[in-house]
Amino acid sequence: EGGEGKAAAQYVSALVEMAKQEISRDNYGKARELLEKALVYPENLGEGKLEGSKDNNINYYLGVATEAMGDRQAALKYYEAASVGSDEVAGMMYYYDQPADMILYQGLAKYKLGKRAEGNARFYKLIDFGEQHVRDEVRIDYFAVSYPELMIYNEDFTRKNTAHCYYVIGLGNLGLGNMEKAREAFNKTLSLDRSHNNCRLLLNGMDR
């Protein structure tokens, strides 16, 4: 118990990061191969996709790679797929909640579709959530799937929540193009949670 989703998340993250590198090298065909691979979990992971998973990040970068290859119409279909999903920001507790990152990619896809107001609404929603909850005192008095992991590692729930809220603030600012504010928020996240892999990847991407 407590390890659900972690191997699958690392599998997808590794493929998406490799695809982003290929995009930066103008190897768009290779990027697409990697991203299409990320859409399907191999059997040896022993885990299927959660119901409702939208793969916003994968579809967004498929759109970017496809557009760079000159097929704007096909790219628009990927951006449409990347733009769907809930825009409600979840807390940091449960692996089956939609990750906040997916709202960032929804917004970026909205931009690509010419729907800037809808994209901005998602980015501001991320920032508002983070600012409203960053000082929350968090305690758990019930059992859930994520609870065993949290207990084994003796997690400080309030500290973990604070790190998550700064991360969410960073996501919103990154989407809006407020790079310094995003960098500041991501650094605050990492000062509280050095193992926040997604935050580190986004921050490293900003510094390239």
Language-model regions: role of each:
Residues 1, 36-47, 81-91, 127-128, ...:
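Amphipathic alpha-helical segments of tetratricopeptide repeats
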Residues 1-8, 42-52, 88-95, 152-157:
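Flexible helix-coil transition and linker loops at the boundaries of alpha-helical arrays
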Residues 4, 11, 45, 55, ...:
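Residue-level recognition of tetratricopeptide repeat
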